[in-house]
């Protein structure tokens, strides 16, 4: 996106106490992906290979997650929560000396776009020494204000330190900042904590830079892109914004959504063209949906691959490891897990198919269960191509049903059934004429004798 990849500092040392959670704030998910992961992905899209993540003491869980996502990442620890400027100071010794531009972003702003960060970096490359990210807020309460002189940023005033006149200004500072690396040491050295909070503010870079004759400018984005997350309510708002982005992108790519606001996607959900998605469908992580698939209302998919022309739902649950073949059919109240449903196979109602293969063109009757777990281990069920499994059958794994075999309804199968054979595993039906009448008469006489 840019000629030269920037250095990057991600600030993630906040304790997130308002989240009321044992999980670190930046690891709370948005669209199935931790907030910090969204930010790291945006930074990585710019080509930054050695970003620095600033965490607080004891935030090993955050550091471990980030290292697993970005191999070249360095961890810096901010020992005390003394403000954003102090956090950048903690990162400074770890910034690669080769970097010409350093981009500072926040781990709790998961909606920031890589394109916006690229614009900031490009502005630095084109002559600005400091570039801040701003937006116009509908309600600017709580935000730092951008004070402009034409196209130049004069200073950033924190809300608590702003005058009444400055608080009327709706141009706000979003948080991210790009700085020419050569100026960073001097800017850090000039920071003081003479403010209402007694903290070292990164926002003071602008005033100090201006005083030193540096060029300070701004790049602007939508307010929604700068939604920060400090509470569960903020998390819900950010989720709603991200979901709307994902829905719009899916529909632009050829997906029909009958009620878009009720469909929930994950960041890695992949769609082909001419996919139709019904109401209240949820896509967990790891779903790949091919061309022409129909997913009906109230279905839940996770870790699933669905091939061209297949039909899912309504009320289907497709769990991780499921592979649904071309023109296969998974109907209402069917659950699959680690199951390969091959081309044209049908599992139409009320079934559990786990640790199994259902061959091409096979038909699974209502109420069929693959009994795959003995309390300690999982076992595999293999159902051949063209097999017919009668309703209300239990297949006790490990077991194999051959190609073209026919299994009688109500069977409890514990042994393999050969190809093209009929398998019936149930008690033989018998009849006792008059038994029911005698039974009822006997019990009625007992009730009468006891006075009931």
From Swiss-Prot:
InterPro entries tied to this protein: Bifunctional_GlmU, GlmU-like, GlmU_C_LbH, Hexapep, Hexapep_transf_CS, MobA-like_NTP_Trfase, Nucleotide-diphossugar_trans, Trimer_LpxA-like_sf
CDD domains assigned to the protein according to its UniProt record, in alphabetical order: GT2_GlmU_N_bac, LbH_GlmU_C
Active site per database record: 349
Q: Which PANTHER family match?
A: BIFUNCTIONAL PROTEIN GLMU (PTHR43584:SF3), NUCLEOTIDYL TRANSFERASE (PTHR43584)
Q: What does this protein do?
A: Catalyzes the last two sequential reactions in the de novo biosynthetic pathway for UDP-N-acetylglucosamine (UDP-GlcNAc). The C-terminal domain catalyzes the transfer of acetyl group from acetyl coenzyme A to glucosamine-1-phosphate (GlcN-1-P) to produce N-acetylglucosamine-1-phosphate (GlcNAc-1-P), which is converted into UDP-GlcNAc by the transfer of uridine 5-monophosphate (from uridine 5-triphosphate), a reaction catalyzed by the N-terminal domain.
The record ties this protein, via HAMAP family, to: GlmU
Q: Which protein, by its recorded name, is this?
A: Bifunctional protein GlmU
Q: Which organism is it from?
A: Parvibaculum lavamentivorans (strain DS-1 / DSM 13023 / NCIMB 13966)
Q: What is the lineage of its organism?
A: Bacteria, Pseudomonadati, Pseudomonadota, Alphaproteobacteria, Hyphomicrobiales
């Amino acid at each position: 996106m840019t000629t030269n990849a920037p250095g990057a500092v991600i600030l993630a040392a906040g304790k997130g106490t308002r989240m009321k959670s044992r999980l670190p704030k930046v690891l709370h998910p948005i669209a199935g992906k931790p907030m910090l992961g969204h930010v790291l992905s945006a930074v990585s899209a710019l080509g930054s290979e050695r970003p620095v993540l600033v965490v607080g003491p004891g935030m090993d869980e955050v550091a471990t997650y980030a290292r697993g996502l970005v191999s070249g990442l360095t961890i810096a620890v901010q020992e005390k929560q003394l403000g954003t400027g102090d956090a950048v100071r903690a990162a400074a010794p770890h910034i690669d000396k080769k970097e010409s531009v350093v981009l500072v972003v926040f781990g709790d702003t998961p909606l920031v776009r890589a394109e916006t960060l690229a614009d900031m970096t490009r502005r630095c490359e084109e002559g600005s020494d400091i570039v801040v990210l701003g937006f116009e807020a509908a309600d600017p309460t709580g935000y730092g204000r951008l004070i402009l002189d034409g196209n130049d940023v004069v200073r950033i005033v924190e809300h608590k330190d702003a005058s009444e006149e400055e608080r009327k200004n709706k141009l706000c500072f979003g948080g991210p900042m790009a700085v020419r690396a050569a100026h960073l040491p001097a800017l850090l050295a000039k920071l003081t904590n003479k403010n209402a909070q007694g903290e070292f503010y990164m926002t003071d870079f602008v005033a100090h830079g201006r005083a030193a004759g540096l060029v300070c400018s701004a790049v602007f984005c939508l307010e929604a892109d700068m939604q920060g997350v400090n509470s569960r309510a903020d998390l819900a708002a950010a989720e709603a914004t991200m979901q709307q982005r994902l829905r719009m992108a899916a529909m632009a790519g050829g997906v029909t959504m009958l009620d878009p606001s009720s469909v929930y996607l994950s960041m890695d959900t992949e769609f082909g063209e001419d996919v139709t998605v019904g109401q209240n469908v949820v896509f967990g992580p790891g779903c790949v949906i091919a061309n022409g698939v129909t997913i009906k209302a109230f279905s839940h998919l996770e870790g699933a691959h669905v091939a061209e022309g297949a039909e899912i739902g309504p009320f289907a649950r497709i769990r991780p490891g499921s592979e649904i073949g071309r023109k296969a059919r998974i109907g209402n109240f069917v659950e699959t897990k680690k199951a390969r449903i091959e081309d044209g196979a049908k599992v139409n109602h009320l079934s559990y198919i786990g640790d199994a293969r259902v061959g091409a063109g096979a038909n699974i009757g209502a109420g069929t269960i693959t009994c795959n777990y003995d309390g300690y281990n999982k076992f595999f069920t293999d159902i051949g191509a063209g097999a017919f499994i009668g309703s209300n059958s239990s297949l006790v794994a490990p077991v194999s049903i051959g190609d073209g075999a026919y299994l009688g309804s109500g069977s409890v199968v514990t042994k393999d059934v050969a190809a093209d054979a009929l398998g019936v595993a149930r008690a033989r039906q018998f009849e006792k004429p008059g038994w029911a009448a005698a039974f009822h008469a006997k019990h009625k006489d007992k009730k009468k004798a006891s006075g009931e």
